[in-house]
A protein has these predicted regions:
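C-terminal structural cap/anchor segments
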Residues: 146-235
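Signature for the C-terminal beta-barrel architecture of outer-membrane proteins
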Residues: 1-152, 156, 209-211, 227-236, ...
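A generic structural motif
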Residues: 247-249, 273
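Low-complexity, intrinsically disordered Gly/Pro/Thr-rich segments
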Residues: 264-273
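Short amphipathic alpha-helix initiation/capping segments at coil-to-helix junctions
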Residues: 202-203, 242-246
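Short glycine-rich, acidic/polar surface loops and turns
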Residues: 249-256
Length: 276
């Protein structure tokens, strides 16, 4: 089962100030159902109303949950903090935005220093410019993951390290994917592309750039250009021996003839490259 919740605040009054501010938090969780392991073991996870409240207010599972969910939090949780600042000029506007994602408490707090993993972007909107109406540039960084180690204290070593967050993966659930397609940032390569049939995200330590722009050079023609490049380091548990790269591009043109109101025709071409 799936549960999500979000809370956002937007402050904007363009009659008094050209500045707008947005702040928010999103959280989502997978819980319930059966977990299938490669050795044939099937784990049925709790899904009662009591368990739903443990998902809504993230807390430990009871005796019916797995040992991992009793030690940690019931279910597979992810979330993000978001912030954006916009400025409205007389004929155009600009917005800078930032999103920090987390898998557990170590990513929600500043326990391991300032948050390094984030998506940072800048959007410029030029409504009066027909050739380029919107330009977006983004930088993605997911390499830190609260550090490289995940270890619970023992009598021999009395310190815990809750890093190696392993974004989108989970020891019980198949992870944040549906039929092999990732539910998240597209620069984190989906499991459907794994050559060995594994359902895990084999590379979630990524550094990438994305740029997109669109426009309408004539009333009948719209276009869109998207370009993304990324470097992949694998995961902390299974790092790549050498850095792998991925490049993607899209060109799309839409024709909306005045002679046929309500109709549009789209022609698109895309290219993928790299060694992922």
């Amino acid at each position: 089962m799936f549960h999500s919740k979000a809370a956002f605040l937007k402050v904007e009054n363009l009659e008094k100030s050209p500045v707008s501010v947005e702040l928010g938090i999103e959280m989502a969780a997978q819980f319930g159902g059966d977990c299938y392991y490669p050795d044939g073991t099937v784990l049925r996870t709790p899904d009662s109303w009591k368990d739903f409240f443990r998902i809504f207010f993230p807390s430990n599972g009871d005796s019916g949950a797995s040992e991992s969910d009793q030690i940690n939090i019931l279910g597979n949780h992810v979330g993000s903090y978001s912030a954006a600042v916009g400025y409205h000029f007389p004929t155009w506007k600009v917005k800078a935005y930032w999103e920090h994602f987390f898998e557990d408490r170590s990513g929600m707090t500043l326990t391991y220093g300032m948050w390094r993993d984030c998506l940072t972007g800048l959007e410029v909107t030029l409504p009066e410019n027909p050739f380029v109406k919107t330009v977006v540039g983004e930088f993605l960084y997911t390499k830190h993951q609260s550090g490289a180690f995940h270890y619970f204290a023992t009598p021999a070593i009395d310190h815990s390290f809750t890093g190696a967050d392993n974004y989108y993966n989970n020891s019980q659930y198949a992870g944040w994917e549906h039929w092999g397609q990732g539910i998240g940032n597209p620069l984190v390569t989906s499991p459907i592309y794994n050559k060995d049939g594994n359902l895990a995200f084999e590379s979630n330590r990524v550094k990438g750039f994305h740029i997109g722009l669109n426009g309408s050079p004539t009333p009948e023609i719209d276009y869109r250009i998207l370009v993304s490049v990324a470097k992949h380091w694998g995961t902390y548990g299974s790092p790549y021996r050498t850095i792998r790269r991925n490049q993607n591009g899209l060109l799309e043109v839409t024709y909306k003839p005045d002679q046929i109101p309500g109709w549009s025709f789209t022609l698109a071409g895309a290219v993928d490259g790299g060694n992922m």
